[in-house]
């Protein structure tokens, strides 16, 4: 699990957002936008797509990440264990364990 101090800080920072803005964010990514309609058009020869989905992300689940990966030919996918929606701030050390190898693969390509 993520260190408590990072979880608390992340929760505090996120809760400081103006509530109507947050509601707009939720509406956009839960209702308005559907990647599945255009995912197959993404050309990974022109732009790399590397999907890192968090085990404890309730809005962007690992299942949704896997589905996006399957819809985007040439993409990569990895489920990040023991982190949530904000892995970079809630557990930076754990996040780097997933991010750095991904960046290494990009640099080697």
Regions found by a protein language model. Give the residues of each.
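Conserved serine/cysteine hydrolase catalytic core
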Residues: 2-70, 76-79
């Amino acid at each position: 699990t993520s260190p408590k101090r990072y979880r608390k800080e992340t929760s505090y920072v996120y809760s400081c957002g103006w509530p109507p803005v947050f509601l707009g964010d939720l509406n956009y990514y839960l209702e308005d936008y559907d990647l599945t309609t255009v995912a197959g058009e993404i050309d990974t020869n022109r732009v790399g797509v590397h999907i890192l989905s968090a085990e404890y992300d309730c809005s962007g689940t690992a299942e949704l990440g896997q589905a996006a990966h399957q819809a985007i030919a040439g993409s990569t996918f990895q489920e990040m264990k023991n982190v949530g929606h904000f892995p970079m701030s809630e557990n930076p050390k754990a996040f780097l364990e997933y991010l750095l190898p991904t960046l290494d693969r990009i640099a080697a390509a």
